[in-house]
Amino acid sequence: MDLVEKLKNDVKEIEDWIIQIRRKIHENPELSYKEYSTSKLVAETLRKLGIEVEEGVGLPTAVVGKIRGNKPGKTVALRADMDALPVEETSDVEFKSKVKGVMHACGHDTHVAMLLGGAYLLVKNKDLISGEIRLIFQPAEEDGGLGGAKPMIEAGVMNGVDYVFGIHISSSYPSGVFATRKGPIMATPDAFKIVVHGKGGHGSAPHETIDPIFISLQIANAIYGITARQIDPVQPFVISITTIHSGTKDNIIPDDAEMQGTIRSLDENVRSKAKDYMRRIVSSICGIYGATCEVKFMEDVYPITVNNPEVTDEVMKILSSISTVVETEPVLGAEDFSRFLQKAPGMYFFLGTRNEKKGCIYPNHSSKFCVDEDVLKLGALAHALLAIKFSNK
């Protein structure tokens, strides 16, 4: 029996077990940096499987499992993120979130369950492993700022790793379909804040003021022109202003106005140009109207997620032995799995969960987000298959 058929048979034994783990985590979602129950479940499950466990790797809720083969080989890292979102679940499932205002609306519950399933398969087939398989259960991917990957890397989780892989469940693709691409697959999220300092006064006498709201509107229109007139239209790129705050009363022109938003890009040159254009636009418009301004970009945001081309070619061939594999367009969402890919070659890929018959049609981050649980065994199978194949390279 070849490796694929062996793993397919093995995963049938634990399909229901994987689903039950997923449902338990789904019922008890935890926000970024607070994944205490989830990490406890992970550590206990790994220990029951006889896997070496290290807790608190860079963050209190981070967990790392290590499976060592019987002969020298490569070190392969597999990653699952664990945190939920501040979303009130409105889906009607029997294992609905028990925590008010918190939901696994991005499928990280499935990521944990699939990697635990992969761990089971790897232990059962330990004689096929060379080197080491490192199981990374990461907190705080949804943080959007520092994120959980960076402190884990600083604590040494990627030391000696030769390859790294990560799966994300997605309703953008049909159930059971793997989707990935060579090169940039997800964007970098440059969060920005613009503050306009004007001079307040009475709403009936705007000529005696420096109106920060009026100036902010001019800035907003000009910023949206960056996409239309400054960036090559074939480049995936977007700017969104997502908050504008100013003022307290209908007859008072305020002193200040504040805008926040995000720039998403897949190219470092485009990213740099856009930030430079924004600074110049804000400075120029504020100068024209006599205001002062601040433009701040969040530091050390998630990098662009870049799949290694050679590894991706090989992985797509391997995954095609267990399901359909398609090449996807880049996604302008962001992922701190990108930090792992800066430390070792690897690949990030999606596993489709869209199933209209089961009502699994809502996008990630929706309060009605739904997962076709039939695909979870595929995720576990993919983890184990890639780990074994690449540990023996």
Curated annotation (Swiss-Prot):
| Protein's job | Can release basic, acidic, aromatic, and, to a lesser extent, aliphatic amino acids.
Q: Which Pfam families match?
A: M20_dimer, Peptidase_M20
UniProt key word Hydrolase? yes
Q: Where does Zn(2+) bind?
A: 104, 109, 245
State the family named in the UniProt similarity comment for this chain.
Answer: Belongs to the peptidase M20 family.
User: Entry's NCBIfam families?
Assistant: amidohydrolases, carboxypep_CpsA
Recorded superkingdom: Archaea
Q: Which GO terms describe its biological process?
A: proteolysis
State the name under which the record lists this protein.
Thermostable carboxypeptidase 2
Please name the top-level EC class of this enzyme. Answer: hydrolase
Q: Upper taxonomic classification of the species?
A: Archaea, Thermoproteota, Thermoprotei, Sulfolobales, Sulfolobaceae
Record's PANTHER family? METALLOPEPTIDASE, PUTATIVE (AFU_ORTHOLOGUE AFUA_6G09600)-RELATED, PEPTIDASE M20 FAMILY MEMBER
Q: Which cofactor does it need?
A: Zn(2+)
Does this UniProt record's set of keywords contain Hydrolase?
yes
The active site annotation covers 302 (proton donor), 373 (nucleophile)
Q: Print the keywords alphabetically.
A: Carboxypeptidase, Hydrolase, Metal-binding, Metalloprotease, Protease, Zinc
| E.C. number | 3.4.17.-
Q: What GO molecular function terms would the record report? A: carboxypeptidase activity; hydrolase activity; metal ion binding; metallopeptidase activity
Subunit info? Homotetramer.
